[in-house]
């Protein structure tokens, strides 16, 4: 069931996308379309939508490219990315990466949940790519402080093979239980 704010955002995007393609005067105008879902202040309108403000530039570009190529699927992002040229994707990635990270003010995980998550992360080597502070690097996403629902859904999609644009993550998360995913999402969201 689509939540009301998400449904409204989808309607706004559907109405504005053709106008943006025809009349965009710059990347800030194009980015306004993104704000219908990802939020005008960097806080997404729905918990299942990721924070873009302050996300790593290379990662944003790769995701837009994957949506455009069909390597990553989403009924909203697929058509949006399909309308973008390579330079548009690079410009959008730079635009959002330059914004300050949005603090969603999510609570820290309880100590037992944090311990479970740290154990899972250590055994899987998560910090090898996402780094010690969960900030990622150029092409690896920042996941510390990302939305709880988005984190949980994304990890489950990788584990279940629904999201395939990163074969390493599919293989890594294949062994995660629901409890592991819930603990990791709670822990990461509160970072």
Label the model's feature ranges:
Residues 1-4:
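Positively charged n-region of N-terminal signal peptides that target proteins for export
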Residues 30-40, 62-65, 90-94, 122-131, ...:
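C-type cytochrome heme c attachment motif
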Residues 82-105, 149, 174-191:
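C-terminal capping alpha-helices of c-type cytochrome domains
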Residues 72, 89, 101, 126, ...:
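Generic structural signal for secondary-structure transition and capping sites
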Residues 23-43, 104, 108-132, 147:
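Sequence/structural segment immediately N-terminal to covalent heme-attachment motifs in c-type
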Residues 7-18:
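Bacterial N-terminal signal peptides
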Residues 27, 42-72, 78-83, 118, ...:
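Gly/Gly-Pro-rich "capping" loops immediately C-terminal to redox-active cysteine motifs
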Residues 43-44, 98-112, 133-141, 159-166, ...:
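Inter-heme linker and motif-flanking segments adjacent to c-type heme-binding CXXCH motifs
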């Amino acid at each position: 069931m689509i939540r009301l704010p998400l449904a409204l955002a989808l309607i706004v995007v559907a109405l504005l996308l053709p106008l943006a393609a025809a009349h965009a005067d710059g990347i800030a105008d194009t980015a306004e379309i993104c704000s219908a879902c990802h939020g005008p202040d960097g806080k997404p309108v729905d918990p299942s939508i990721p924070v873009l403000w302050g996300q790593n530039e290379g990662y944003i570009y790769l995701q837009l490219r994957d949506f455009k190529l069909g390597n990553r699927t989403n009924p909203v992002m697929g058509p949006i990315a399909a309308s973008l040229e390579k330079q548009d994707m690079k410009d959008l990635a730079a635009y959002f990466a330059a914004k300050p990270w949005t603090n969603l003010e999510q609570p820290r995980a309880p100590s037992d949940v944090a311990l479970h998550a740290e154990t899972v992360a250590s055994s899987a080597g998560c910090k090898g790519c996402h780094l010690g502070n969960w900030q990622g690097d150029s092409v690896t996403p920042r996941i510390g402080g990302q939305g709880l629902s988005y984190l949980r859904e994304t990890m489950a999609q990788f584990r279940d093979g629904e999201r395939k644009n990163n074969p390493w993550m599919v293989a890594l998360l294949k062994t995660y239980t629901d409890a592991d995913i819930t603990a990791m999402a709670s822990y990461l969201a509160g970072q």
